[in-house]
Amino acid sequence: MDIKIILMLIIGYLLGSIPSGVWIGKIFYNKDIRNYGSGNMGTTNTFRVLGKKAGIVVLLMDMLKGTITACLPFIFHVNVSVLLIGLSAILGHVFPIFAGFRGGKAVATSVGVLLVYNPLFFTIAWAIFIITLYISSMVSVASMLGFTLVSIISLFFNDRVLTIVAIVLTVFVFARHWKNIERIKNGTENMVPFGLGYRRRQKNTK
């Protein structure tokens, strides 16, 4: 394997390992978000525990980890798929060396990689996520359904690598959301405070 590819994979993993939510929480709020809410260090739990501003910052930072990593092949002038290099950042986000290998669910970082690989596909994926989130008011549902639909839509792009990576990530996202799936079945899944699902739950509790 080319030494540059190895170097890119290492850099990508280290970038992905940056625990944005943990660092933002500790530095600015004196909180380790892994001890609150769902215990996850990702964007959703950051919104829930630290608020909107911190959540947006962590979302952008987590996406940026994937975006920067996906740009490495262009920076190093190496002809290798940005998706494959981007996977190293996703792996780092899920198993971060800087946070005891307790990471997030890789949704934002995956989207960041997709932005570089195919902006059109990124736009489609983002639109699916937003629409699904508005309907369900559940980030978990939007993530799982979004990745599923993205995998199906990727078939129409005639890009084998994209389809394979999309399917692998979909399976992985479902595996990382198994606790959420149980809560969805029990009707106890956390909701964001907007959208049709949230309004329906609020109406039923009155």
UniProtKB/Swiss-Prot annotation:
Catalyzes the transfer of an acyl group from acyl-phosphate (acyl-PO(4)) to glycerol-3-phosphate (G3P) to form lysophosphatidic acid (LPA). This enzyme utilizes acyl-phosphate as fatty acyl donor, but not acyl-CoA or acyl-ACP. This is Glycerol-3-phosphate acyltransferase. It comes from Ligilactobacillus salivarius (strain UCC118). Pathway: Lipid metabolism; phospholipid metabolism. Belongs to the PlsY family. GO terms for molecular function: acyl-phosphate glycerol-3-phosphate acyltransferase activity. The keyword Transferase applies. It is found in: Cell membrane. Coiled coil: none annotated. It comes from the Bacteria. Keywords: Cell membrane, Lipid biosynthesis, Lipid metabolism, Membrane, Phospholipid biosynthesis, Phospholipid metabolism, Transferase, Transmembrane, Transmembrane helix. Pfam families: G3P_acyltransf. It catalyses: an acyl phosphate + sn-glycerol 3-phosphate = a 1-acyl-sn-glycero-3-phosphate + phosphate. The keyword Membrane applies. The gene is plsY. Its EC number is 2.3.1.275.
